[in-house]
């Protein structure tokens, strides 16, 4: 599979997630969220850093998780790289791990896109532990 084929497939997956799968589970379509996810995917595929700004309620978390999933499912480089996400709060870190990823995994597995749940780990600095 060549790089351009994988780029196209990854972008189609984002559209499928936001236009078909998530709405089937009661979530609203948000054009800004879809555009944001496509921009993030482009940066991931090109190996660039993306600094994206979006208002409250746009759906940033699902936007970057969908982009990361699409980038991993359809890699454009020779080497698979981990995707690192930095959040604004510990509460959001926990929500990504316990709410967002499980729902996205369930939706993608039900559609046959994934065969096993998405995996993630939380890395915390020493200031988060009693020593």
Task: Give each language-model segment a name.
Residues 28-35, 60-63, 87, 91, ...:
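Generic recognition of stable, solvent-exposed alpha-helical segments in well-folded globular domains
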Residues 62, 117-120:
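Amphipathic alpha-helical transducer elements in NTP-driven molecular machines
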Residues 76-81, 112-118:
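Short helix-terminating capping/connector loops at secondary-structure junctions
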Residues 103-115:
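A short alpha->loop->secondary-structure connector
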Residues 80-105, 119-131:
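Conserved Walker A/P-loop ATP-binding site and its immediately adjacent core
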Residues 39-45, 60-79, 99-105:
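Walker A/P-loop NTP-binding motif
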Residues 2-53, 62-66:
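Conserved pre-motif I regulatory segment
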Residues 57:
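Walker A (P-loop) phosphate-binding loop of P-loop NTPases
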